[in-house]
Amino acid sequence: MKIAILSRDAKLYSTRRLMEAARANGHEVQVLDPLRCYMNITSAKPTIHYKGKELTGFDAVIPRIGASITFYGTAVLRQFEMMGVFPVNESVAISRARDKLRSLQLLSRKGVGLPVTGFAHSPDDIDDLLAEVQGAPLVVKLLEGTQGVGVVLAETRKAAESVIQAFMGLRQNILVQEFVKEAGGTDLRCFVIGGKVVAAMQRRAKEGEFRSNLHRGGSAEPVKLTPQERATAVKAAKVIGLNVCGVDILRSSHGPVVIEVNASPGLEGIETASGVDVAGRIVSFIEQNARPHRTQTRGKG
């Protein structure tokens, strides 16, 4: 097969591993910077061009689209879909996952466990919002944040009010969530491919930090998931409509709660911690599922 990888940098670990895995199975691979792709949006013959040449003959596309280029990246992916190329993750599903509020609303509607979460626009509603999420300590999150950036732990009510007012003053959209203290600064990253959890790791925040993201200096180790945690991860991926994703879960006193569904999860941490060839599993998924014009808009909302 001929496989395209949408990635800004061919040297990144995840991109390199996907290239290696695909080529090891005899596939032709081309890494494309999505920002260098341009499109002819025509009903008779939609096309994509890259550095002056028309892109043709691709059987599948693997989107590795960073949060900062979601709009243009998903537009390029959508054009591949219009051309009948099989997407590992569909553009609409990536858009759902990138909108934290939308994804939480969809997960809530389907009964997936979540931390108590509030959302408001007016500073006049801060008191009521804090009451809804059971007061401090609580977590304030920027809707557009990634890799732990824009996530603040407010340990007192006064601190919470100050942080929320500051973000609102900057016209930033924020979520306010309960702080799951019993998680102890750890979370679970469950890697889902084709409706199955193929690998998992437990991430632990560094000393003095509550965010367990590896980009924030956290550490990772292999972990054994409970059946309920495994089922929660699979259901979350299905609700958002992602074939390949990382589902982040906290172990709370009332069961597993999902804090994020990542549409473009990194491979280095999960492969190192679990010892699983995740890149190879993604290529196997493509081999088993890629067919022309097989884009069906999975999930709803």
Swiss-Prot record:
Stored Gene3D superfamilies: 3.40.50.20, ATP-grasp fold, A domain (3.30.1490.20), ATP-grasp fold, B domain (3.30.470.20)
Binding-site residues, Mg(2+) 2: E260, N262
Cofactor binding, note field: Binds 2 magnesium or manganese ions per subunit.
Highest rank taxon of the organism: Bacteria
InterPro entries tied to this protein: ATP-grasp (IPR011761), ATP-grasp_RimK-type (IPR013651), ATP_grasp_subdomain_1 (IPR013815), RimK (IPR023533), Rimk_N (IPR041107), Rp_bS6_RimK/Lys_biosynth_LsyX (IPR004666)
Binding site for Mn(2+) 2: E260, N262
Cofactor: Mg(2+); Mn(2+)
UniProt-annotated binding residues for Mn(2+) 1: D248, E260
One GO location term (cellular component): cytoplasm
Pfam family, one: RimK
EC class: ligase
GO molecular function, one term: metal ion binding
Keyword vocabulary terms for this entry: ATP-binding, Ligase, Magnesium, Manganese, Metal-binding, Nucleotide-binding, Protein biosynthesis
GO biological processes: protein modification process; SOS response; translation
Domain ATP-grasp as annotated: residue spans: 104-287
EC number of the protein: 6.3.2.-
Ligand binding (Mg(2+) 1): D248, E260
Binding site for ATP: K141, E178, F179, D187, R211, S212, N213
Entry's family note: Belongs to the RimK family.
Entry-linked HAMAP family: RimK (MF_01552)
Name listed for the protein in its UniProt record: Probable alpha-L-glutamate ligase
Source species: Thioalkalivibrio sulfidiphilus (strain HL-EbGR7)
Name of the gene this protein is made from: rimK
